Design a protein with these regions (language model features):
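Arg/Lys-rich, positively charged N-terminal/basic patches that mediate binding to nucleic acids
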Residues: 1-30
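A generic "cationic amphipathic patch" detector
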Residues: 25, 45, 76-77
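Amphipathic alpha-helical interaction segments
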Residues: 15, 36, 50, 72-74
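Intrinsically disordered, low-complexity regions enriched in small/polar residues
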Residues: 9, 30, 44, 66-67
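Low-complexity, intrinsically disordered/propeptide-like segments
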Residues: 19-22, 35, 66
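Enriched for short, Lys/Arg-rich terminal
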Residues: 1-7, 54-84
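A short, surface-exposed loop/turn module that caps and links secondary-structure elements
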Residues: 30-56
Length: 84
C-alpha cells in the first residue's frame, strides 16, 4: 500500500518547528500519511466546498483537508488553542 503524501504549508511548518512538545503533532502527521481517512474532532467546509478537518492535540489544533484525487493531505495550519 502506498503512503499518502502529506503536504505541510510553510507557516504551519514554522509553527511546528517552534513547538517545545511536538511529538504528538508529528505522530499525528505520520498517522495521516499511513491512513488519510482520519477525520478531525471538528469539520467545516471552506468557501471552495472542501471539508476542513480540525484535530485537537493538547494545546494545538491542526487544520487539514484530504484531496483523494491527488492522494494528498494538506496541513493548512497549526494553531495554539486555549482552554476557556
Amino acid at each position: 500500500m502506498n503512503n499518502t503524501l502529506v503536504y505541510i504549508h510553510s507557516h504551519a511548518c514554522d509553527h511546528l518547528r517552534g513547538l517545545a512538545n511536538r511529538e504528538d503533532v508529528i505522530r499525528f502527521i505520520n498517522q495521516l500519511e499511513s491512513n488519510p481517512e482520519i477525520i478531525g474532532d471538528y469539520r467545516q467546509p471552506d468557501p471552495r466546498g472542501r471539508m476542513i478537518e480540525v484535530k485537537l492535540l493538547g494545546r494545538q489544533a491542526i487544520l487539514f483537508f484530504r484531496d483523494p484525487y491527488a492522494n494528498i493531505v494538506k496541513i493548512l495550519d497549526i494553531r495554539n488553542v486555549e482552554a476557556g
